[in-house]
Amino acid sequence: MNFHEYQSKQLLAEYGIPVPAGKVAATPDEAVEVANSLGNGPWMVKAQIHAGGRGKAGGVKFCKTTDDVKAAAAKMLGTKMSTYQTAGVELPINLVLVTTAGEIVKELYLSILVDRGTKTITYIASSEGGVEIEQVAAETPELIHALNVDFVEGVQGYHGRDFGFKLGLNAKQAGQFASIMVNLYRLFNEKDLALVEINPLAILDDGNLYALDGKFDSDDNAAFRQKQLVAMRDKTQEDETEVTASELDINYVTMDGNIGCMVNGAGLAMATMDVIKLNGGEPANFLDVGGGANKQRVIEAFKLILSSDKVEGIFVNIFGGIVRCDMIAEGIIAAVKEVGVKVPVVVRLEGTNVEEGKQLLRDSGMAIIPADNINDGAKKVVEAVKNAA
């Protein structure tokens, strides 16, 4: 789950990490009220969407007067914005964050994440903040520093001070940096987060460090014990079909292609998409119907796939281990009848009760195309889509 900047800053502040004073507003007049409550300007007005790159898209404005604040908020609120991170999708701006604006002396980068390669919680820091860290890694990798945290020892103050001096901080600032690292480690673990990225972590004209922007990503598997985070979810920032799928407990991700996929098992689903690509097709989605799939679940999966008008064909690829192929076949037949599927459907079944499942499909009298294996199925669905065009 992703979070808005104002939510990320709220969590950072709760854990003693300094952030500029600020508050969200839903109308231009509210934005002016917030600005006045923060004292004399200048202020920053920032569009709240689940994406980075807002500045380049016009979603971050420096304001010297309350008239500027009102104008900036009016221009953003009620509109939609796309950035280089949204893949062409426009996200609604329902809130703006109004904060104090100090003069930036230096921008740093700091993040904490789980490094699956080293199997540790890892910090990444750089003296080059305010830009994409991928760009820094490509152009000046020597400016990036990493720390793999020992689970027994945890992060200590000396780790942070050492990092701070590597980034060119003075003694006072290195001490602040160490405190931020220790508090960030506590936040990361206690909230079951997968990523926290502070970019930039800035030195302002008062000589102190502040988190000017924060990107959070939580571990959805821990949602049952993170009620505060779950309450922060903003479904207006998410793909509608993905929201519906999550409510049905179906793993679904929208993609840009035209061939819908229904598969049981995440690994098989990814392999299916790869084979479709290798055969010249483009997957329209990732959909793992799950090992405990039943007839109704298959029907709901078809509805999710066909909710996109981009879908011109469907490949059902099922390996029946826990799930029975005959039950999947019953679900496919029921779905085709109930949903009124008008695009080619290719089905590959293998595993438990496979012959019974295939017989049900044959006896249905429906124009369902059988496939012998994953490659055969991918070829057939790509060909069927081309022939139907």
From Swiss-Prot:
Cofactor: Mg(2+)
Alphabetized UniProt keyword annotations: ATP-binding, Ligase, Magnesium, Metal-binding, Nucleotide-binding, Tricarboxylic acid cycle
Binding site for substrate: N264, G321, I322, V323
Any one GO BP annotation for this protein: tricarboxylic acid cycle
Binding locations of Mg(2+): N199, D213
Assembly with partners or alone: Heterotetramer of two alpha and two beta subunits.
Pathway: Carbohydrate metabolism; tricarboxylic acid cycle; succinate from succinyl-CoA (ligase route): step 1/1
Molecular functions (GO terms): ATP binding; magnesium ion binding; succinate-CoA ligase (ADP-forming) activity; succinate-CoA ligase (GDP-forming) activity
Domain named ATP-grasp: residues: 9-244
Catalytically driven reaction(s): succinate + ATP + CoA = succinyl-CoA + ADP + phosphate; GTP + succinate + CoA = succinyl-CoA + GDP + phosphate
Protein name: Succinate--CoA ligase [ADP-forming] subunit beta
GO cellular component term, pick one: succinate-CoA ligase complex
Free-text remark on how the cofactor is bound: Binds 1 Mg(2+) ion per subunit.
Domain of life, per lineage: Bacteria
Family: Belongs to the succinate/malate CoA ligase beta subunit family.
Function of the protein: Succinyl-CoA synthetase functions in the citric acid cycle (TCA), coupling the hydrolysis of succinyl-CoA to the synthesis of either ATP or GTP and thus represents the only step of substrate-level phosphorylation in the TCA. The beta subunit provides nucleotide specificity of the enzyme and binds the substrate succinate, while the binding sites for coenzyme A and phosphate are found in the alpha subunit.
Cited Pfam families: ATP-grasp_2 (PF08442), Ligase_CoA (PF00549)
PROSITE patterns: ATP_GRASP, SUCCINYL_COA_LIG_3
Residues annotated as binding ATP: K46, G53, R54, G55, G102, E107
Enzyme nomenclature, EC number: 6.2.1.5
